[in-house]
Amino acid sequence: MRGTKLPPTLFAEGVDKTPWKRFTGDDKRKGYGFVYVFAECSKHGIPMGNVKIGYTNSVTKRYKDVQHYNGNRIKVYGHWRGEEDTMKMFESTAHSIARDFHKHGEWFHFSNTSAIIDTVEDINKHYEV
C-alpha cells in the first residue's frame, strides 16, 4: 500500500506537539530515524497494556509491520525524529525511562492508559531536537 499514513498521534495534556506538527510520513533523507511508542489496543481502541518502544528508519513501514503481525489494533502514542545516531541513543533513553514496565525485547507492559501517557511525557522531556 503506497502512501500509507500514520493515524493521528494521541497526546497527553501538556505534551509539546511541535515535533509532530504536520507529520504525515517518513523523512526520506538518509541519516534520519525515528523512535516510536506503539500501544496494542482492543478493537474499540482501548490500550491493553502491551507497548512497543523502538527505533526505525521508516515509522510508517514499522507501524504497518507491527500491525500486520499483531492481531490487535495498534495506536501510535508517540514518535520522535532526529539524526540516526542521536535517535539510536534516544531509544536507549526511552527504554531506561520505561524499564520498570519491561516485558521482553522492545515490549513493555503497563497497567493502565495513564501510565503509558506518563511514560510518553517522560520520554518527551528527554527529546532534544
Per-segment meaning from a language model:
Residues 1-129:
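Non-catalytic accessory segments flanking enzymatic or RNA/DNA-binding domains
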